Each structure stands twice: as structure tokens, then as C-alpha cells.
Amino acid sequence: MQDIPREQSLIEYPSAFPIKVMGAHVPGFLEAIVEIALRFDPAFAPDSVEQRPSKAGNYLGLTITVTATSRDQLDALYRELSGHPMVKIVL
């Protein structure tokens, strides 16, 4: 797959940008993700988080929608989410 140059982003900024985050269904997971989202988007609405537990209840899928203002912001947000110890995958 070929990388798209930064100056040719397919995303128009600012825009509402949904991010799916999957992690262990443990106390504090939702709060940790909301805290990260708020650092990158101070207008983020914590009550807008969509939650989906796995069938067995071991994992929790979250969809957060942030206001994306730049590719750098999104890259940093993905890095921070992916690096969090409770997070298994970020899409």
C-alpha cells in the first residue's frame, strides 16, 4: 500500500472523526479513554461514547468521535491510545 503524502490528506479538517478502541473490560478503561480524548479535543463529549461489550464480557469496544483538526493531531491521538496498557487495538 502506498502512503498518501501529508499535503494530500483525504480528510477535510476540521471534521468529526470516529475512532474505535478495544480493550479489556476492566474498571477504569472507559475513563482512561475519555481522558485521552479530552486532551486532544477539549470539546469532546464523554456521554457520546458508544460502548459494546464482547459476547463473553471480557472485552469492551468503544467508539469515540473527536473533532479532528489536523493529521498531526490524529497521529498523536492514535499513538497515545495505542500505547495505553489497557488498549488492545485502535481502528
Curated annotation (Swiss-Prot):
Gene3D superfamilies assigned: 3.30.70.260
Pfam families in alphabetical order: DUF493
Record SUPFAM superfamilies: YbeD/HP0495-like
Domain of life assignment: Bacteria
Family designation: Belongs to the UPF0250 family.
PANTHER family: UPF0250 PROTEIN YBED (PTHR38036:SF1)
Protein name: UPF0250 protein Lcho_4239
